[in-house]
C-alpha cells in the first residue's frame, strides 16, 4: 500500500482564517474537506501539497436549511427532504456509502480526477 507523503495539517475555524492561511502559504497549500479524491492522488504522488488546510471545522460551510455549503456531504444531501428528489437521487448514486459519508459537495464540484492508465 502506498503511503501518503508528509504534510502539515491546519484546521482553521473560519473561512477568513482559511483564506489567510492560503494567502500566506501560496501554492504549497491545498484545501481538504472529505479528501476522497485528494488523498488517493497524493498517495500516487499526483499531488504533493506541503500543507493541507481542512475545512471540516468551519461551521459556516455547514449551514442548515436549503443552502448547501462546500462542506455538505453527499449523505447529508440524500437526507435533506426539502431538496428536489432528483438531486437527492443523484447524490445517492455516487460511489459507496463510505464515500458518500466523506465526500463533500465542494470536493465533487472541484474534482480533479486524472486517468491513471
Regions found by a protein language model. Name each.
Residues 1-117:
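C-terminal structural segment of proteins
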Amino acid at each position: 500500500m502506498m503511503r501518503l507523503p508528509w504534510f502539515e495539517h491546519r484546521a482553521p475555524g473560519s473561512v477568513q482564517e482559511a483564506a489567510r492561511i492560503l494567502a500566506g502559504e501560496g501554492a504549497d497549500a491545498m484545501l481538504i474537506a472529505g479528501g476522497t479524491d485528494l488523498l488517493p492522488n497524493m498517495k500516487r504522488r499526483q499531488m504533493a501539497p506541503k500543507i493541507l488546510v481542512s475545512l471540516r471545522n468551519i461551521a459556516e460551510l455547514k449551514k442548515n436549511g436549503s443552502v448547501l455549503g462546500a462542506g455538505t456531504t453527499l449523505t447529508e444531501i440524500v437526507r435533506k427532504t426539502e431538496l428536489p428528489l432528483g438531486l437527492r437521487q443523484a447524490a445517492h448514486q455516487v460511489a459507496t456509502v463510505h464515500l458518500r459519508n466523506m465526500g463533500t459537495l465542494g470536493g465533487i464540484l472541484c474534482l480533479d480526477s486524472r486517468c491513471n492508465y
